[in-house]
Regions:
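A conserved ligand/cofactor-binding region detector
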Residues: 1-647
Length: 647
């Protein structure tokens, strides 16, 4: 179906009247933005139903991509672009009396991620949808995202990121599909005719309410879903305590449940923080698996063929509890024996590793599992015992047994759990995968070499070239056509233009225009004036010592000293742009941010450096900022410690 400008305009007007009780003459920019989102959501909802019916009829294998992060950025322009109606939507908004760029800029970045882990998940979801693969992403509906970064006196201050205020237009709550999650309590077991009967009692219940975000594929009617779980207590407020004036205590259980889906990565340098993180992970995993298995049983009537019709890809170790949770469902709920359940599990789950840093490989204290997840702990113990026996029989080496253990000395090792219970382990670049085989997981690879493979990180090039850089997109189309939009390999055809003076001149003009556009954005958003005649030298990524922002700072200090020693030296002007968030509890990273801002104050106020050297820290780096910055960048600093970066 073709959606014209007039049809979209009428749809937006209808949404304003029905949802916000106003006309375009009375509407705010925010209401127009949400009305546009709702109009597009309706288009995608129709296609989503068709996609689900087609998948159900053809009984296709489904991909379930589980990640604590999905760094989606903004969805309005992206979905309009993929649906092929961005020009029509732009015209419709303009004819309603609004500035389309201002309306698009109203949309907040979805607060569902932080770094490369989440951006990879978002790119995969876009790609799978474009390829017509039946896929669903799963995560948590974080109320306040990770945090909004504010720089005050050169230092990072964390503020709540209330993205749902405007971003909730994309979400479709489905309370009728809620799942119940159990924490704490105690477990009783008994044998009955050769079957283990498990009773979990005295637990705390939390409801997981699904909120679905639809994802449109490019140039296809296929629509996939990102299912986000919102945590709520099933217990009403304690009216007796409330009437006694004990307002906080009356709401205590509701507040504890709500905290599970409040923020991404709560600080975990104390017991309560660790407990909340583990609750988040199990809440997310249990809700997802209950939903997947329920849908599978409705279709096939059994879980015995679960692995034939489903694959669960876990993005890093945060969803690793999918392994014991699937075992719990297969054994306790479906009544399967251990061996059959383990065979199904091991052929259903695949694990993507994202780090080679030993200290970053996730682990948990045993006592947390015993307290919060008693039944999962029982299953984990049996997984660990059987895996350890397998390693012992293969290596006969106590040191290797300890290194590969799922549980050792009161600590649960999640990466080892993923290796033990998964059918595949992949790195995200050839070098990274090689390091995993030769070093990080060398012993596991020696025992099960076929399990380890490489899947090099990709990027949604339609977003990062065509959508955000229309000048470059136009040049590419003029040179090689638009086939690259669905077949990125066609970009290699540009090699033949490497020495084409006309193409290079046009490329230089496009870069200059993008730099000017970013400079205007930076002036408007952050009040900083950039020297667009200088090289834009950019380092934007999570703030971490191994990312070596500090090394970049030392290089800048060296350049500054050279200019001080010889102000008239031959010097190519450079503007160094930093963008990074530091984890709230990461003191060293925060001090590096302060150092960058102090250095910026010193250099930018020194007359010697005028029009030669500039340093700018970009506050609250996010996907929508990257969409402005990437087309303007000329040098991208990728200087992580050798052998420590996954990709």
């Amino acid at each position: 179906m073709t959606y014209t400008k007039d049809a979209l305009k009428e749809a937006i007007q209808q949404k304003l009247r029905l949802n916000y009780g106003c006309t375009e003459k009375q509407a705010t920019d925010g209401e127009i933005m949400k009305a546009c989102a709702l109009a597009l959501r309706d288009i995608m909802a129709v296609r989503s139903v068709d996609t689900q019916e087609r998948t159900q009829e053809q009984q296709e294998k489904r991909v379930h991509y589980m990640s604590l992060e999905f760094l989606m950025g903004r969805s309005l322009m992206k979905n309009a672009y993929n649906l092929g109606i961005l020009p029509q939507l732009t015209q419709a908004v303009e004819e309603l009396g609004f500035s389309a760029p201002d309306i698009f800029d109203m949309e907040p970045d979805a607060g569902l991620g932080n770094g490369g882990l989440g951006r990879l998940a978002a790119c995969y979801l876009d790609s799978m949808t474009t390829l017509d693969i039946p896929a669903t992403g799963y995560s948590i509906c974080y109320e306040l995202g990770i945090f909004k970064q504010k720089i005050v006196d050169g230092q990072q201050v964390e503020l709540p990121d209330d993205w749902l205020n405007l971003g909730d237009a994309w979400l479709m709550p489905k309370p009728q599909e809620a799942e119940e999650i159990h924490f704490g309590g105690r477990v009783r077991t008994r044998w009955d005719n050769g079957h283990l009967m498990v009773v979990h009692e005295d637990y705390t219940r939390v409801l997981a309410i699904p909120c679905d975000m639809l994802v449109a594929g490019y140039n296809t009617d296929h629509v996939n879903t990102l299912r986000l779980w919102d945590a709520k207590s099933p217990k009403p407020i304690d009216m007796q305590l409330f009437s006694q004036g004990q307002y906080l205590k009356a709401n205590e259980e509701r507040a504890m449940a709500d905290s599970i889906s409040t923020i991404l990565y709560p600080e975990d340098n104390h017991y309560e923080g660790k407990s909340l993180r583990l609750k988040q992970q199990y809440f997310f995993v249990s809700a997802t698996l209950q939903s997947i298995t329920r849908q599978h049983i409705q279709t096939y009537g059994t879980l015995k063929n679960f692995h034939e019709k489903n694959v669960i890809q876990i993005n890093d170790t945060h969803p690793a509890l999918v392994i014991p949770e699937l075992m719990r469902i297969l054994i306790d709920d479906a009544g399967l024996g251990w061996d059959e359940a383990w065979d199904i599990t091991r052929h259903s789950v695949a694990y993507t590793n994202h780090t080679v840093l030993a200290e970053a490989l996730e682990s948990w204290p045993q006592r947390l599992f015993e307290t919060l997840l008693p039944r999962i702990w029982q299953i984990m113990q049996e997984i660990a015992r059987r895996w350890q026996q397998k390693v012992d029989n293969f290596y006969h080496d106590p040191k290797k047994t300890e290194k590969m253990a799922v549980i050792w000395d009161g600590v649960v090792h999640m990466a080892n759990l993923c290796i033990a219970g998964g059918m595949a382990v992949n790195g995200v670049s050839a070098l990274h995968s090689d390091i995993l085989r030769r070093d990080v997981f060398r012993d596991a690879c020696g025992m099960e070499p076929d399990k380890f493979r490489n899947v090099t990180n990709g990027v949604d090039h339609r977003r990062w070239i065509s959508q955000i850089n229309p000048g470059l997109d136009g040049l590419i189309r003029d040179c090689i056509g638009d086939g690259y939009l669905t077949h990125a390999g066609h970009l290699s055809d540009l090699d033949r233009f490497a020495d084409d003076a006309a193409v290079l001149s046009r490329l230089e003009q496009i870069k200059g225009d993008n730099k000017q556009a970013f400079a205007r954005w930076a002036k408007r958003q952050q009040g900083v004036t950039l020297n667009t005649d200088a090289i834009f030298n950019v380092q934007v990524k999570r703030l971490h010592e191994y990312k070596r922002q500090l090394l970049n700072v030392l290089h800048i200090i060296s350049l500054y000293q050279q200019l001080q020693d010889d102000p008239n030296m031959d010097f190519r002007p450079q503007t160094f742009l930093f963008g990074a968030k530091a984890a709230p509890g990461y003191a060293v990273a925060k001090r590096i941010i302060r150092l960058i801002n102090s250095l910026a104050d010193q250099i930018n106020s020194d007359p010697i450096c005028r029009d030669k050297l500039q340093v700018v820290f970009l506050e609250n780096y996010r996907v929508s900022m990257a969409e402005m910055l990437m087309p303007a960048s000329e040098v991208s600093q990728q200087i992580s410690t050798a052998g420590k970066e996954a990709s």
